[in-house]
Amino acid sequence: MLRLEDLPGTREEPIFVKAETPGEVVFTGKSQFGFSGQYVVVTGLVFRDMYGLMDAVEFRAGTKSIAHHCRLTECVFEQANKLPDNQKTRWLSVHGEEHRVDSRYFAGKANEGATVVVWVTEKPGKHQLDHNHFGPRPELGTNGGETIRIGTSDVSELDSRTVVNDNFFQECDGETEVISNKSCGNTYRNNVFERCAGTLTLRHGHRCLVDGNVFLGEGKADTGGVRIVGRKHRVINNYFEKLQGDSSRAAIALSSGIPNSPLNGYVPVVDALVVHNTVINCEQSLRRRG
């Protein structure tokens, strides 16, 4: 376990935590890495076959030592071998405010737990996840196989205002929610989803924007598009082609919901804007369902 606490970087002079030779510093097994402070850049590290701990990498060095205005870039997270147990593990937990996670590769996660989790508190995090490659993730067979989750149902009425843009999602088949949105005010823009057996799911929360994304099913079973639950979402300028999912995995699926739904239920779709989307050769273009 490596924890770096309260690193005092500044915007003008950030602190760098980096491999002397990129790609040759490898964390593996029951390793854990956490850091806190501000204006810290972590780069060039490899995290391989991580298991046995709930969070492999965290933007914090303890529950009361949280990072702010930091960046994780040019790192690799991968599972290359079968793990000795199937204990739930999240590869990356993003705590704090205004972090950037970019230019990284994630692939092969086969155990339970989201690949990346953004935690939501009373103060909007305003994070950015951009230019990452999320490679193949095999089907888990149960919940807990999201590639990205932003928030949880109990805080889903709070704003995160996280931006997820210009990422490549490739065969992310962990579960039906490739991205699980569970907070308010987030933006998903210019991402490409290729052969992913699931959807970008606005599961909880309101006022999110899904703009300019590309969903390519290539005829693969269960490939889906955008699933909408909640109020005042905007789904605009997206492209859907050869998706084979139906019902909740249709190209665009809107939930009828439950009146007076609890936070962990299904809030009806209200005041959604769904315009200027292109749907080509999909099994089911638009579905309104309970």
Q: Where are the regions a protein language model picked out?
A:
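Beta-solenoid repeat scaffold
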Residues: 1-26, 33-44, 68-70
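Glycine- and acidic/polar-rich repeat regions and solenoidal domains
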Residues: 2-5, 29-36, 48-70, 74-290
